[in-house]
Amino acid sequence: MFNKHSVEIDWGGRPLRLETGKVARQADGAVVATYGETVVLATVVAAKTPREGVDFLPLTVDYQEKTYAAGRIPGGYFKREGRPTEKETLVSRLIDRPIRPLFADGWRNETQVIVTVLSHDMENDPDILALVASSAALTLSGAPFKGPIGAARVGFINDEYVLNPVLDEMPETQLDLVVAGTSDAVLMVESEAKELSEEIMLGAVMFGHRHFQPVIDAIIALAEKAAKEPRELTVIDDSAIEKEMLGLVEQELRAAYAIAVKQERYAAVGKVKEKAIAHFFPEGQEPKYDKLRIAGVFKELEAKIVRWNILDTGKRIDGRDSKTVRSIIAEAGVLPRAHGSALFTRGETQALVVTTLGTGEDEQYVDSLAGTYKETFLLHYNFPPYSVGETGRLGGTKRREIGHGKLAWRAIRPVLPPHHEFPYTIRVVSEITESNGSSSMASVCGASLALMDAGVPLKRPTAGIAMGLILEGERFAVLSDILGDEDHLGDMDFKVAGTEQGVTSLQMDIKIAGITEEIMKVALGQAKDGRIHILGEMSKALDRARAELGEHAPRIETFKIPTDKIREVIGTGGKVIREIVEKTGAKVNIEDDGTVKVASSDGESIKAAIKWIKSIASDPEVGEIYEGTVVKVMEFGAFVNFFGAKDGLVHISQLAAGRVQKTSDVVKEGDKVKVKLLGFDDRGKTRLSMKVVDQDTGEDLEAKQKAEAKAEDEAPAQAAGE
């Protein structure tokens, strides 16, 4: 019944198994991949006919994690998986980026890749396995895919590269880098690093590339057993159309791309395009070509003209040379009520970035396959349509916004102070108000400034820069701080963020084969120069964190109480803690280890809450004097609340010097009194005294009398000695 085929290799000290022919047999390609005890199913289905009216590759990638993979049931009312989580969205993009450039030009068939996590062993992150399984399924599917690709995760522990570190090793690593590519070339890099050098980063990329070669060989071996016949793809020769169009509009198109201002340039290019379309579709005549085809040729011509111009003259669209960064204006503290804010403008790209500080109540609970954890640093990126002069629908967060936000998050996280030193929940929001290239890196720069403006003690300021590449044969140009057009028309999008000490994040997407290690080395070196320049421009606005937190930010004080006192501080059903919060106005968070965080924008509220909590969590000391309130008057004495929630008895004989006939002659309920703790009776009840304390000054009269008596005893002896 099953026509099963499989291959198995040892990879990074663990078995990797790829199997097809048993599960999801009606898909064009289906592979069950197992690494350790983590299992994923990758399927590929491509439509039989091209999609009408599109001039792009209609590819969708969906990665989904099933909670049963970790032996868990989903939360919520419906008890089933809902919309994609952030992790699922990010891994979907991670798979999409290296496979998209490998589809044959002209492939317009709707293609869907679905990857499902079936089992998770809590050791091997499924993302790498998902990439490998997707590559294998595509290679088997018959779709025109110029793969296969391999992928690997690279760590850096104790100054050594580690292949596919397990989840328990991740807290120790200085690097979390994912690299994917073919046997000849690197196509995609995604990473977070703790201020590592460019040499270490490049070494990690090449280490990963070398170590996923056995995976590519395994996929090829599986394809030799089970691959479907390749689909036919008719490639249309448009060289004659391009030659005719080039003669018609070349000079005008070159002139349009010499206009530095983006909107003016777009308008000029639009007019040239209208001229080309009018030429190929004369009124009253039967058109010889499809309009979409002519538009596609025009797009190709645009790319060639921009690329030729850069390689031939060294000048870019806006007149810069390959290494120059656009003019930068950095401002901090631009919003009066925000805890921290910055406006970062680089050319026609602008980000308004705002930092908000919160407490433990604001932490984000993340439900993942590995379990639930709390996230204390959030970075959200918003890209409204007005930022590129367009109209559009506002609504849910798009995949691109999630991806760009995570890239900036990775760049900033390594320079944040440890949570035990700065116990705030931090949310950074980047509003892209203008965009013409590398808005994610503008978000990094703006986030660094906004955090420092809020008083967050970053290790060092952080900046980011986007690099591009034009490669034609042996000639190439690495471009610093690319424009949007250079991103679309170039061969590489290479984003690097970091401090003056090293790289904190690297993301690379390469659209073609042939990018050598030497080219990547040049790009990293040029990116470092650009990053240092940007940091210098940012320092004109703010070069270090402000000494004080933002005026409107909450203050947090942290201290510890004995764990056996937590229940008393919280009270039955939270009664005590609610009373503390209501009466002091401070927020209180108590952790299982006894760590208490008290937060408020009012310092007096914090002091009052701390005093209250400490009075509950600690024990009164015998012989100490305390202020208290009479809470109950009895015939035999008065009960006084004197130490947080603790009450004690002042016996009628301890109310005042001399004989007291009635307790009410001395005190009444609500009176503020000063008492001394005498001790505890045989039943553990607290014994207090008022008569040994001066009710005006709080002085210990008993101690005073003893001191005076001692002085009198010593006086005759001193006189005799004289």
Curated annotation (Swiss-Prot):
SMART domains: KH, S1
Residues annotated for Mg(2+) binding in this entry: D487, D493
Alphabetical list of Gene3D superfamilies matching this protein: GHMP Kinase, N-terminal domain (3.30.230.70), K Homology domain, type 1 (3.30.1370.10), Nucleic acid-binding proteins (2.40.50.140)
Entry cofactors: Mg(2+)
Region (Disordered): 691-722
Every S1 motif domain range: 623-691
All copies of domain KH, residue ranges: 554-613
GO MF assignments: 3'-5'-RNA exonuclease activity; magnesium ion binding; polyribonucleotide nucleotidyltransferase activity; RNA binding
Key word Ribosomal protein present: no
UniProt feature, compositional bias: Basic and acidic residues: 701-713
EC number: 2.7.7.8
Similarity remark: Belongs to the polyribonucleotide nucleotidyltransferase family.
Function: Involved in mRNA degradation. Catalyzes the phosphorolysis of single-stranded polyribonucleotides processively in the 3'- to 5'-direction.
UniProt name for this protein: Polyribonucleotide nucleotidyltransferase
